[in-house]
C-alpha cells in the first residue's frame, strides 16, 4: 500500500492511525503476508546522511542494512534502536510494520536521499522524476529480499 500526497496537501499521517482508516483491501493484504518493509521519510538536521532501520524484526533490519551499505556508501545505516530517535523506531504495536506475524522493518530515509538534485524537487512527486539514490535503495532492497535466508527470517 502507499500513501501518496500532492504538493497542495502535505500532511503527516501517523503510521499508528492506518488501521483506523484502512480499506478492506489493506486489511486483507495484512492477512496474507508474514513480514513487511515500510519506507518513510524523516528530517533531522544532525542525521541528514543517516538511514534509520526501525521496526521489531531486528534480524531483518541488520540484513537490509548490509545491502544498503554497499549501495549507498556515503550514508550511515543505523539499526541499533537506542541510536534511533524514539518516535522513529517503529515499535508501536499499531504501527503497520508490526502487524504481520514476523513484524518487519521501518526504513526512514533522510531528505538528502529523497531530494532529486537534478530536477530540484522531491523524487516521484508532482512531475519530478526519481532521484538516482531512490533507484539505488530500491535495487538494494530487492537484492536483500532475494537473498533472504528463509529458514532464519520466515519460519519463526
Specify the residue positions occupied by each region the protein language model found.
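N-terminal catalytic or cofactor-binding beta/alpha core of small enzyme domains
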Residues: 1-156
Amino acid at each position: 500500500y502507499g500513501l501518496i500526497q500532492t504538493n497542495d496537501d502535505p500532511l503527516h499521517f501517523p503510521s499508528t492511525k492506518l488501521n483506523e482508516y484502512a480499506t478492506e483491501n489493506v486489511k486483507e493484504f495484512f492477512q496474507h503476508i508474514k513480514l513487511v518493509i515500510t519506507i518513510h521519510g524523516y528530517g533531522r538536521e544532525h542525521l541528514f546522511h543517516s538511514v534509520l532501520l526501525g521496526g521489531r524484526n531486528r534480524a531483518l533490519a541488520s540484513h537490509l542494512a548490509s545491502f544498503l551499505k554497499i549501495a549507498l556508501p556515503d550514508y550511515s545505516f543505523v539499526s541499533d534502536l537506542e541510536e534511533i530517535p524514539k518516535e522513529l523506531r517503529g515499535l508501536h504495536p499499531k504501527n503497520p510494520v508490526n502487524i504481520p506475524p514476523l513484524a518487519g522493518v521501518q526504513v526512514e530515509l533522510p531528505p538528502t536521499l529523497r531530494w532529486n538534485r537534478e530536477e530540484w524537487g522531491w523524487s516521484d512527486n508532482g512531475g519530478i522524476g526519481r532521484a538516482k539514490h531512490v533507484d539505488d535503495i530500491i535495487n538494494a532492497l530487492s537484492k536483500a529480499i532475494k537473498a533472504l535466508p528463509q529458514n532464519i527470517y520466515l519460519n519463526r
